[in-house]
Design a protein with these regions (language model features):
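Short, surface-exposed loop and linker segments with low hydrophobicity and enrichment for Pro/Ser/Thr
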Residues: 24, 28, 36, 111-127, ...
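Active-site or metal-binding loop neighborhoods of secreted/extracellular toxin and effector enzymes
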Residues: 17-20, 178-223
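ADP-ribosyltransferase catalytic core
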Residues: 135-142, 146-192
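Glycine-rich short-loop/terminal segments
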Residues: 39-155
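Exposed boundary/loop context
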Residues: 6, 11, 33, 49, ...
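Hydrophobic, membrane-inserting alpha-helical segments
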Residues: 1-50
């Protein structure tokens, strides 16, 4: 469970700050870092040197001083409104998840290297959105995002933020039921776009109820 996970990390010299309000009295962890390997072979956070999660990469949090978001606070902030509505299963390295997708036919790593991907289970029915162009991409698919992360953005800004292969024209609603197991993390630069948004992947599962909303511009810009 989360408490056990945090306790284990604290025992190895890691400051766990942000998970369920737990604050361990140890040396302050500047940001999430990857190094130690957990029981299941997945990465956990430690004080190892190396590249880390980038400051300021969550664009929708522009009013927050990123220098104040450290360690587990950063990961909690990624969850946003979902923070108290999910169960955290694992922290995984972006590299391990990218390898998983490569083994399933993806030739472009979807998650930013040297960042943390969170494996979560939804505690309640949850509504996400999905954008698409109707040609290269469609209403149904395995990648979704939170509505608040794209509301007010132009299609071009959304394409840049989520490194999409084509400019989206439409938006759909995606309802995932309680108990759904998904992953979330930072979008890797792809197709010449910067990425940096927070995406959710359905882990190749055929789950969710998809419903058309309509024009992305009308929905996002309030037309």
């Amino acid at each position: 469970d989360t408490a056990g996970m945090v306790a284990g990390m604290v025992a190895s010299g890691v400051t766990a700050k942000g998970l369920n309000g737990i604050e361990a009295e140890a040396n302050k962890l500047a940001k999430p870092k990857l190094g130690d390997v957990g029981d299941g072979g997945d990465a956990v956070l430690n004080d190892a040197d190396g590249p880390v999660v980038k400051e300021g990469s969550i664009e929708q949090l522009s009013e927050i001083e990123y220098k104040e978001l450290t360690g587990y606070e950063y990961l909690d902030t990624q969850l946003g409104n979902l923070k108290d509505k999910v169960k955290l299963n694992q922290y995984q390295s972006a590299e391990s998840v990218n390898d998983w997708w490569a083994n399933n036919g993806y030739d472009r790593p979807p998650y930013t290297p040297k960042t943390v991907v969170q494996d979560i289970t939804l505690d309640c029915d949850t509504i996400f959105v999905r954008v698409y162009d109707g040609n290269i991409s469609g209403l149904r698919g395995g990648w979704v995002m939170c509505a608040e992360d794209i509301k007010g953005l132009t299609p071009e800004q959304i394409q840049q933020k989520f490194a999409l292969p084509s400019t989206p024209k439409y938006i759909g609603e995606v309802k995932l039921k309680a108990g759904s197991n998904i992953r979330m993390g930072e979008v890797n630069p792809n197709y010449g776009f910067n990425g940096g948004g927070i995406q959710f992947d359905l882990k190749g599962q055929y789950i969710g109820e998809f419903k058309e909303i309509g024009s992305l511009v009308d929905w996002s810009m309030g037309k």
